[in-house]
Amino acid sequence: MSGDRMTSMRIPVTKTPKVYVGGAFIRSESGRTFPARDANGEFVANVPQCTRKDLRNAVEAAAKAGPSWAARTPYNRGQIIYRLAEMLESRADEMNAALRQFSRDWTDGAEQEVALTVDRLVHYAGWADKYEQVLGNANPVAAPFFNFTITEPMGVIGTIASDAFPLLGLVSQAAAAIVSGNTVVALSFSLARSLVGSAAPARYPSRPCRPPSRP
């Protein structure tokens, strides 16, 4: 039997993606999935179908990570966000391919969307230690005391990314929240569907984005 014939008889081994919650990739509580298909209608993978319990677990994980993330200095948060931009830039080709695979509309715009996403991360990384100077204020009062306006993290922020620009939309919303010390529970069906086509892009944002424990 020839090598070409043996290769053609192989059964495809498809990637089974998981849900990213609290710094780890886990299975959905329901155990259910739905098929993800590319722009040509070809099956790519079974995507986990999350439940309300999965969402609650995500909110609880974000709330638990919040204090340690908010306690970091603005400069350190900027470093972490900038590191994510570096990692996305280094694997831009993989993300381009993942975006193109699932929509013909992204064929010409995928590269531009990834580039804009990197730029957006750099933008927010630069604002990490500056936004307090812009939004904070010393308020004038007619009394013998000081009155200041300061910014404080709100806590857990929920975001739903646009389907039109799934990567740029998700990152723009999430970065704006985490730069000021908040944690995020993000939903993006289009981006999740795209990421199953390329395993690496789904993994490398996890490390720099996860609010790690302080030493």
Predicted feature residues:
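Conserved small-residue-rich beta-alpha loop and adjacent elements
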Residues: 135-206
